[in-house]
UniProtKB/Swiss-Prot annotation:
Keywords linked to the UniProt accession: Cell membrane, Membrane, Sugar transport, Transmembrane, Transmembrane helix, Transport
Major site of localization recorded for this protein: membrane
UniProt function note: Mediates sucrose transmembrane transport down a concentration gradient.
Protein's name according to its UniProt entry: Sugar transporter SemiSWEET
Species per Swiss-Prot/TrEMBL record: Bradyrhizobium diazoefficiens (strain JCM 10833 / BCRC 13528 / IAM 13628 / NBRC 14792 / USDA 110)
Length: 86
């Protein structure tokens, strides 16, 4: 398969999974309520994203690096708001 197409698919997948966190982030930011969000899920998710980011950095995989860096910021922000707002 064409390497450009492979990268394009990677960036498209990365964009979809990253953008998926934005509505939740915005909702918690606006309502100042994270009561119904699972703390355990976001703790594990942020850890997993950090590990994927490290893997992407070590392997030089641009889609992994970009998507996991941004997603980790969004998920980490939700985690911080969960701890702050409950």
């Amino acid at each position: 398969m064409d390497p450009f197409l492979i990268k394009l698919i990677g960036f498209a997948a990365a964009t979809c999974t990253t953008v998926a966190y934005a509505p939740q982030f915005i909702k918690v930011l606006k309502t100042r309520s994270a009561r119904d969000i699972s703390l355990g899920m976001f703790l594990v998710m942020v850890l997993g994203l950090a590990l994927w980011l490290i893997y992407g950095l070590l392997s030089g995989d641009a889609p992994l690096i970009a998507s996991n860096a941004v997603t980790m910021l969004l998920a980490g922000g939700i985690l911080v708001m969960k701890l702050r707002y409950g």
